[in-house]
């Protein structure tokens, strides 16, 4: 999807990718009348919408994440397609972990959510150069992977799955509140591990 056969700026290509993925998930769930699929989609969508705040904070306040001009409009300092982009990894983590829970056990499902978060977000960070945003002024592993954000993203993936299981049958307004809590967990973890790794550990090396 990033290699579109006609000239488009990377921001528009990413918007098309995000829109296509979101419509594909929702459409499949509706056509198949897959209630748990639809519930998971909307829960991670709420989280993704709120994730604009951590991205905005990291880019505007800490200045360690850059969203350059990529041809798509911004919300603050963040490209607006990010509102739906977090759906992609979070839905994959949640759906696979749900299947593992059905086949094995809840403990193995929790472990899978942690491992999937590490793998998916780790690969995403490592391949960030393909996209339009990038980290700056932080310690990088293999030239692309920002160390400080690894644990916060694992917390994000695991807490999304864990809290979805706990509250999947609640009213939608309650799920929105829980999604906001997930965002706060991620934002707090990102802040803490940035301070710990960049200002304490790396500074003292």
For the regions a language model picked out, list residue spans one by one:
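Aromatic-rich, lipid-facing transmembrane alpha helices and their immediate juxtamembrane interface loops
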Residues: 1-205
